[in-house]
Design a protein with these regions (language model features):
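Cyclophilin-like peptidyl-prolyl cis-trans isomerases
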Residues: 35-281
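Short stretches within intrinsically disordered, low-complexity N-terminal or propeptide regions
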Residues: 5, 23-25, 50
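Sec-dependent N-terminal signal peptides of Gram-positive bacterial secreted proteins and lipoproteins
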Residues: 17-37
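Intrinsically disordered, low-complexity serine/threonine-rich segments
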Residues: 7-10, 27, 39-40, 45
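Position-driven detector of the extreme protein N-terminus
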Residues: 2, 27-30, 55
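Short, Lys/Arg-enriched N-terminal segments with co-localized hydrophobic residues
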Residues: 1-15
Length: 281
């Protein structure tokens, strides 16, 4: 009887060790943006914490945000729509529009942080060519940062918004752990094609066609909030992605040898003049 109980205890301990090991492996994988398994991108899985339950910290002033009348990821920013200009020292500027109606928490969080100077002076601590560039951590280590509420907030995922090339997404360490870190997808069409061929995520034919045409990283679909899209500056994105990198201390060659610094983020409104986008602050 004692031997049986001891055997059972030993078996339980062995199982627990396996569970802990698996949990640690999953945690390590999800800490790296794009390594976690993607969810079904063909379904609308939008989920957001009720904002009334969260209070913006008093140190942040929320800017006026004007949303686009219609959510269209690849359309030009419309007149009066809120946009951001991200000036990267030595590289140039990138501009982004936002999807307030589909990702209100992520958009409000990002624009508030940007307008309060939170991102100014921060670095792109993680750069992987043909994948993405990541920033939003004041410590520059990939382990810091906070939301305007001082706590994590939920993912906001919908089938209309995909991790296409130029998409602005929230970085996380697992579902519903969004803070201040973000990444910009840089992968081009050939990389997207390889990703689709691997078949790691279920996508509709329309979604697949968008990846093949625009580029992006299919396996990220459903696991990360897409809350913005680049409207200008793809050449800057590619230049940053092509910078020389080194081991980040964890075995991943993703840390820029020379710091890539966000000099300034400016929140403004878009204007269309003769079909060309210009910024009016």
């Amino acid at each position: 009887m004692i031997a049986s109980e001891q055997s059972l205890k030993t078996e339980r301990k062995a199982k627990m060790r396996k569970i802990i090991a698996a949990a640690c492996l999953m945690a390590a994988m999800t800490l790296c943006v794009g390594c976690s398994s993607a969810k079904d991108g063909s379904k609308d899985t939008t989920k957001a914490t009720t904002e009334t339950k969260m209070k913006v910290q008093s140190k942040y002033k929320v800017p006026k945000i004007t949303a686009a009348k219609k959510t269209d990821q690849l359309a030009d920013a419309q007149k009066g729509e809120t946009i951001v200009t991200m000036k990267v020292k030595g590289y140039g500027e990138m501009q982004f529009k936002f999807f307030m109606k589909k990702a209100p928490l992520a958009v409000k969080n990002f624009l508030t942080l940007a307008s309060n100077g939170y991102f100014d002076g921060q670095i792109f601590h993680r750069v992987i060519n043909d994948f993405m560039i990541q920033s939003g951590d004041p410590t520059g280590t990939g382990t810091g940062g906070e939301s305007i509420w001082g706590e994590d907030f939920d993912n906001e995922v919908c089938e209309e918004l995909l991790p296409l090339r130029g998409s602005l997404c929230m970085a996380n360490s697992g579902a519903d752990t969004n803070g201040s870190q973000f990444f910009i997808v840089q992968a081009k069409a050939d990389t997207a094609k390889k990703g689709l061929e691997e078949g790691n995520v279920e996508l509709t034919k329309k979604q697949q066609a968008l990846f093949l045409d625009q580029g992006g990283y299919p396996s990220l679909t459903g696991s990360y909030t897409v809350f913005g899209q680049m409207i200008n500056g793809y050449d800057v994105l590619d230049k940053i992605s092509g910078c020389k990198t080194q081991d980040n201390g964890s075995g991943e060659v993703s840390q820029p040898v020379k710091k890539v610094v966000i000099e300034k983020m400016t929140v403004s409104t878009a204007e269309l003049i003769r079909g060309k986008q210009v910024v009016i602050c």
